[in-house]
Curated annotation (Swiss-Prot):
NCBIfam families: PRK00110.1 (NF001030), PRK12378.1 (NF009044), YebC/PmpR family DNA-binding transcriptional regulator (TIGR01033). This is Probable transcriptional regulatory protein Swol_1435. GO terms for biological process: regulation of DNA-templated transcription. It comes from Syntrophomonas wolfei subsp. wolfei (strain DSM 2245B / Goettingen). The keyword Kinase does not apply. Signal peptide: none annotated. It is found in: Cytoplasm. One of its GO terms (molecular function) is DNA binding. Coiled coil: none annotated. It comes from the Bacteria.
Length: 251
C-alpha cells in the first residue's frame, strides 16, 4: 500500500501543463467510450463503470461537451475507431514490476512504441503473465485524516458495514480497500456520510512492494514511468516500487 500512496504523491506534485491536461482529457474520453461499450449503456445510473469514468472526468474539469461526445462514440451516435483494451507487463530498472492498462486503436503500433520506451530506458517489455501474479485488482478509496468528519472507530465500522474488505492507515490518510464489484456501493455509502474522498478508483495494487533506496535508481525508474504515463495509449501505470520519503526529497 505504501508504494501506491507515495507514488500517488509524486504524481500529484507534477506540474499540470496544458499539454498534460489535454492528454488527461483524451485518456478519460477513451475510458468513457470503453465504459459505454462494455457496459452496454450510455446512462451512468445504469452503468457503474461509466458513472466512475464521468466522475473522474469532472474531477479534472473536463468540459461537458467532451464527456457527451465520448459517450456518443460509445453508443455509436458518433462514428469512432474501435478501441481495444490490453494489459502489458514488464520490468523497469532494478527489476521493478510494471503493469500497463492500454487503450489503443492499433495494437501493433502501440506494442512497438511501448517496447521501445522500455528498452531505451533500461527496462524491458515482458510476456503476458510475467508480473500479473504480483498484483491484485481492488477498489481503492482514500480519505485524508484531517478531513475525517467522525471518530476513527465509527469511520472504520461504517465503511466495513458498507462492504469494504479492509481499511489501512497511512501517514496522512486512510485507504479503504474493496472488491471491484462492491467499489461503487462503498464509495456511494461514504459519500452519503459526507466523507470527503481524496481519490477513488479500481486499481492494480502490488501484493508486496520493493523499497528503492538508491537515488539514481529511483530517478531512472520514475523517468520510465513518466514516459509511459505520457504515452497516448497508456491509461494507467502500476508498479511494485516503494520510494522512501528521504529518497523522494533527494530527487
Amino acid at each position: 500500500m505504501a508504494g501506491h500512496s507515495k507514488w500517488a504523491n509524486i504524481k500529484h506534485k507534477k506540474a499540470r501543463s496544458d499539454e498534460k491536461r489535454g492528454k488527461e482529457f483524451t485518456k478519460i474520453a477513451k475510458e468513457i467510450t470503453i465504459a459505454v461499450r462494455s457496459g452496454g449503456s450510455g446512462d451512468p445510473e445504469a452503468n457503474s463503470k461509466l458513472k466512475l469514468a464521468i466522475q473522474k472526468a469532472k474531477a479534472i474539469n473536463m468540459p461537458n461537451e467532451n464527456i457527451n461526445r465520448a459517450v456518443k462514440k460509445g453508443t455509436g451516435e458518433i462514428d469512432s475507431e474501435t478501441i481495444e483494451e490490453i494489459i502489458y507487463e514488464g520490468y523497469a530498472p532494478g527489476g521493478i514490476a510494471v503493469m500497463l492498462e492500454i487503450a489503443t486503436d492499433n495494437r501493433n503500433r502501440t506494442a512497438s512504441e511501448i517496447r521501445h520506451l522500455f528498452s531505451k530506458n533500461n527496462g524491458n517489455l515482458g510476456e503476458s503473465g510475467c508480473v500479473a501474479w504480483m498484483f491484485k485488482r481492488v477498489g481503492l478509496i482514500s480519505i485524508k485524516k484531517d478531513k475525517l468528519n467522525m471518530e476513527e472507530e465509527e469511520f472504520m465500522l461504517k465503511v466495513l458495514d458498507a462492504g469494504a474488505e479492509d481499511v489501512r492507515e497511512e501517514d496522512e490518510e486512510y485507504e479503504v480497500l474493496t472488491l471491484p464489484e462492491s467499489f461503487m456501493l462503498v464509495k456511494e455509502a461514504m459519500e452519503e456520510e459526507k466523507l470527503l474522498i481524496e481519490e477513488a478508483d479500481i486499481v492494480m495494487l502490488p501484493e508486496n512492494t520493493v523499497d528503492i533506496t538508491d537515488v539514481d535508481m529511483a530517478g531512472k525508474i520514475i523517468k520510465l514511468i513518466e514516459l509511459l504515463e505520457d504515452h497516448d495509449d497508456v491509461q494507467n501505470v502500476y508498479t511494485n516500487m516503494s520510494i522512501p520519503d528521504e529518497i523522494i526529497a533527494a530527487l
